[in-house]
Amino acid sequence: MLEVTTTYAVLDLETTGSTYDNGDRIIQIGVAFVQNGQVVDQFATDIFPNQEIPREITKLTGITNEQVKRAPKFEAVAEFLWQKLSNTVIVAHNIGFDYKFLDKSFQAHGYPAMTHDRVDTVEMVRTLFPTADSYKLGEFCLAHGIQLENAHTAIDDAVATAHILIMCQEKVATMPVELFAQLQPFLHYFIGQTGDYMALWFKDHKGPKRPYEYIAPFVLNPKSANFHIFPAGFGTKEASYLQAGDLKVIEANHGVSLAPLQKIMVKDVAPFFYEQATTSTDTNKRPKYAFLTANAGVVKSLAYVVSALSADDTASQQTGAKSGVNNGQTQVVISTSTVILQHQFLDKTVQLATNLLGKPLKTVILKGQNHFIQLTKLQKYIQQLKQHPESALKRDVLISVALFVWLHETETGDLHELNPGLNNELYWQNVNRQSKGSRNDEIQRWADYAFYERHVTEAKSADIVILNHAYFVYHYQDLIDQAILTEEAKVIIDECHQLPVTVHQQQIKTFQSKEVEETLTAMERTVHRLMDKVVTNNVKIQAVDKLYHVEKNLQEAWGNLDRFIDQISDRFQTKSYYQRHTAQKSYYIANDYYLVANWRESAQKAVTAMSKMVSPLKVIARQLYQMGILSKRAYQQILGQLNQYDYAIQIWLETTKSSENYYADLQVNLGKHNVQVTIDRKLYTSQSHLAAIFQAIPCKMLLVSASLEIVRSKNMIQSLFGIEDFAWYSFMEDSYTQQFVQGRNHQVRGYYLKDFLSIDKYNEDQAAMVIADLVETLWTNRKTMRKIQVFFQSRSLMRATQFEMKQRMTRSDYGNLIVQNNQRNLDRLARQYEDSSRAILFAVASFQEGVHLNAKTDAFVLTRLPFSAPDTPDELAKQDYLKSLGDNYFDDVALPDMLMNLTQIFGRMAASGSQDAIFISLDKRLEKAAYADQIADVMPDALNMQTVKLQELKRID
């Protein structure tokens, strides 16, 4: 039972604004009083603020000037409220706002400063409920079954917050003793007295509700994920089938039916997977590779997964294996472009396939180790926080507390489960800097809680393994060695047009002068530390002479690094000055120039000298340890640091090498007091690397995209993928027919605007105003414009338009504007858009490739044709490379890439547009450019473009 002597006054205020000192005042007060885990009393009143309530506050809260006109002033209720709050603990959802605002209101009327204990529910839910999608009051309540009918009504918000408080009390009281013991050293970091009361609640410990396993310092959930997705019903007695070549494939079962287009796909794709692969010219056999192109949103993923699994089932039956029983090997391996799409595929497509087939499917998501919690690294980092509390940031401490709680709950260790706010980049950089053991060491130390290693092991016997392209490219040989990519497996590459980009990114090697300087400084400290040990202890050992060579290399490294900075400054001083006045951020360095650049040679000499220091320092440290001069812990620490330095140095050595296959992307920042330089060494073309990957994989591969039609029409399959012999399945026209025509009684309306020039004729500020004019006009049509998507090609223009909208919109309306900016969690952005009753989404055109939106959108705005900027280092490198081949950059790369991006936009529009959705292009090159006929080829036939005035859009119904 929770202690009964304390009364918690759970407070919520509604105010005219956020700052008391700026003249804002209270307009409504709600207090819910909690004792013994129950709401025992309430206090609620409107307050007359002696001023007009801003219109946006009325829209947000529903509180009007008329409503508060006869309400008491604050001073009229102050004494009663002061007495009600005496001897209570003040609780609020964001205590910093409500407590301070109320305190200043009291003091303004002669009361002393409040000295109540304070408890904040925001910090508690962030740490105690680490997997919650949102910590906003309304969204958290909705997700956890707490009634909140009138959000932004003070008493309703206060009562809801009271129930959150009770949830937190219960969760703390049911924690395992070992878990709370790990949290206790960090409780003083919580705001006010929040941590003190958490400790008080734990005194009434009830014992954990779930079993747990304690492997110090972590309390872990012994329930392991079994990785099976279960169907709505078992068996195929009621199933209906279609014939696909020699295969019988289920087309309807347990409430799931293949759509007509999916059936057509299955009839082509299932035989491809079933028949023996060959790369010969034998016409009776299917090639090893096939390409499938169909529009986004037709659920082609269900068609190809069912095709692959059905082919495997049929083969199993013919060899005598029991249908539906995995033979101990992976059946289907799917790679998609992003981690978000991996999880969407699992949640949506695999569940549909499971229902259709009437059997469970073991499905494992594989992604990089850093996507899973690594307990060895986390343990070391938390130990650092405990040992050095003076330098520990509150942010890092509270994230660590949340992770302790989460580890008691998670079955997978997948960081995707966590609220995005816990995926702080700086925090995880600090964690990932810690060393860890080998794969076998991790398994031996943590057993089933070596989460990444467990996923790899489980993948070997999975029905479906879902990868992302980065993992596929980096680990394909590991997947072959681990018997996941076998001859019997069936590989599907979704969003395959992104695969060459992934290979290109995976091959990038980076040299950052700041990191090199910091590493060299740290190595110098290590040299001096070891030298001090040698001198202080008058050591005469064989390794002493190595210190001379280390010191010599140290000086050589510093000299060459300084020379590198000076040479960069001399070479790029003028260019960097002009760069301040342009949008250029970096320089393209062609391979022939990179080869002879004196600054590259200096950088290479610097890191070469650093590399020569590592091995001697290890030898010296080992001998000092063997002599008892260094403790085991100190020796292991030095060894771990040197290994980290060596890993970075090898990358820098690779970066500073010259090769005809690589160019450099050079970024120079000439500050007043220092110069920072970044060199990214990049591939000119990824074709040979990608071809090597495909040749190594022993099984059939289906490559899928909505953007392949234009690639094939330009004969670019071989240049992009290195594949010559392949099957081709195109369903683009069938896709558009299904999405745009079926179920509609009219063509899709598309518009150009008479009022404006084509957007490419304006500068950025002018373009932002044009876009804002259009969006503002659409937004005023509240009857038909509920959801609006605006596609940008430039983030800079997107930010400029966002600023323009902020100047024009009310605070309430501006709250409906969702902007991609630099958010890493696109999934959360998509959910925010989908869950809103009205919303405007500003996103770069590529946003749609990483996220499948289910929300029905009423207007799609194309601000500018999705061409890549031609003067970036990457595009300049393409121009150089194509020129060397005698090809044309615009015709062979820029235009096809733009058409592929445009196809993606049209596909998403077809997939997520409402019944009466409209399309607006502010770029008139769509119809007037010399290449307009090629654009017309990728536009849906059902899209009917016409020219109108801006004001006519207000009357669209």
PLM regions: where:
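Conserved motor-coupling elements within RecA-like helicase/translocase cores
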Residues: 456-462, 813-841
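Acidic, Mg2+-coordinating catalytic module of metal-dependent nucleases/exonucleases
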Residues: 86-106, 130-132, 136-198, 919-921
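Conserved RecA-like P-loop NTPase helicase motor core
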Residues: 755-763, 825-923
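A substrate-engagement module of RecA-like helicase motors
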Residues: 316-462
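Acidic two-metal-ion nuclease catalytic site recognized across multiple nuclease folds
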Residues: 1-2, 167-242
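Conserved pre-motif I regulatory segment
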Residues: 232-293
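Conserved non-catalytic scaffold segment of RNase H-like nuclease domains
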Residues: 2-117, 130-152
